Structures are given as C-alpha cells and as structure tokens.
C-alpha cells in the first residue's frame, strides 16, 4: 500500500485536483495510520533500512561475482542485482528466459530474464528480502549453475 501527499503552491494543487480521480482521494484508514507513524519517525527507520539495503546489496554482488561465469556490477539505484549470466547460455539453455526457467525448476529461485528489460544474457534478482533468504537464494543459484558446467 502506498500513500502520498503534495505540498505545492495553490495553482498546482488546483490543477492536480482537476485531473485527480476519486479512486485516489480516500486512502484506507490503516494506510493513513502508517503514514502518521512514518512522519513521527524523524527519519530513523529509513536511515536504518538504507544501511540494511547497502549490506544486502554488497553481499549479493560479492556472492554473485564469486560464481564462475557470473559478473555483477554494484547497482546504485533500486534493490535489484542485474548479473550477466551469458556464460551459461549454451546447449539446451538458449537464452536468459530458458536460464530463468531452469533456475526456477532446478534451484527453486525466481529470477526475471534480463531480456524483459532489454538486456539479453542477464537476470534480475531482488534483494528486498532478508539476508537469510538472499544467502539461501544465491547458494541455490550457484548449485544450479554448477550443474550446467
């Protein structure tokens, strides 16, 4: 659930209300309470989460780069790693879509083919989960890729 608000000069607010639909004008009560708690936080929770995401990012990049044939540069934006896995696109694995399906079947890890984002030979992984899940997921990917040689 997401909740947002705008602080702007009156002329902009008036223009926004002219195009805004009723579907976004009455947020649910629990979302309003969540927003209130976020505003009371003074930025402590976001700062803590930024540190946590840096740890997760650094771990997943290092762990992926330790796998033979996988190269991952450190992302600077959202919480996704985007490693190059073209080394494993051979034989029965014809493309990153096949590799993603293989990782799901063999490793029980869901990844998104890079071709969905215009980059064939890559996969996208989210690190918006616990460190424990990240470690297990990367280990499963490693074991599955080792079977491919």
Identify the residue ranges that each predicted region occupies.
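PLP-dependent class I/II
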Residues: 1-149
